[in-house]
């Protein structure tokens, strides 16, 4: 799976009517949902609300507000009129009290300067420790201690219909919160929609109907306790989908794993198979007389990669990983990211009407 680079320029048009970049407009110089489950969750939240007229969302907002920051970036870009300064903004979440902040890679990628604005009104210069275009997570370090670090919950325990509150700085309005529910889990969005450098899909995402807007990218999606369950990353604008409030967040488990790796090593490694893939659709299956109707077609193999070593060749269709059915390249990515470099995984590959098992030893790539 191959990966490229993004150069921040100016406000991007929406590509293919896809998702608007949450990191916000560069101010250059120049889901389906809740039903009964949601009602039960809301009722439970109301029972747990503090005394008086304070809603559960207000209490959640009070808890998370100190830990959500605004990330202001600038870079010098060339133009026919000479060097121009481009500015942008996003959001972030205080991860550790010793100065580490999690945000999106597409927020800080290519930035020459980073400034972090805290809820108390203070501003600190930030340094990008590292970013991961595969997951769109980055870590920024500020020279300050005793920061109000957020509490991170286990995103593996989430259920559709539970309360979700998004916190960030949409359009520069710091400390903004919106509420809704978790509308779906294990969602996948194409790589081009964040505007960052990833060329593989973002997978295993949380879908929410809590309003997420430009500038909220890198902010927090939290549960009823005020604990972070995800890092906001993208949204589908209603004008282009006919749907209202389709937002997406990177699960907290992914965000913290990647952040820890960046803090420790400056980069995150991901399992590498060494294949190029496209989704197998019914139309493609009919056109090329493929015996299966879904999966990920192997269009290319790195001759020096683990797939080649295992004997996988172009033209096969990956239909399962460790016995788990694969219906798309996103499914395959999600399944592989549950493993570590060095692990051996069994891939089921259909070719010429026959399914074969291949044992692939994953390499690391970051």
Where in the sequence are the language-model features?
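PDZ-domain C-terminal substructure recognizer with occasional recognition of PDZ-binding tails
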Residues: 127, 138-141, 260-267, 308-313, ...
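C-terminal motif of bacterial Sec signal peptides marking the signal peptidase cleavage site
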Residues: 28-30
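Short glycine/proline-centered loop/turn elements that form peptide/ligand docking sites
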Residues: 109, 158, 279-282, 289, ...
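Serine-dependent protease modules
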Residues: 32-286, 292-293, 303, 333, ...
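Conserved phosphate-coordination/catalytic loops
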Residues: 18, 51, 326
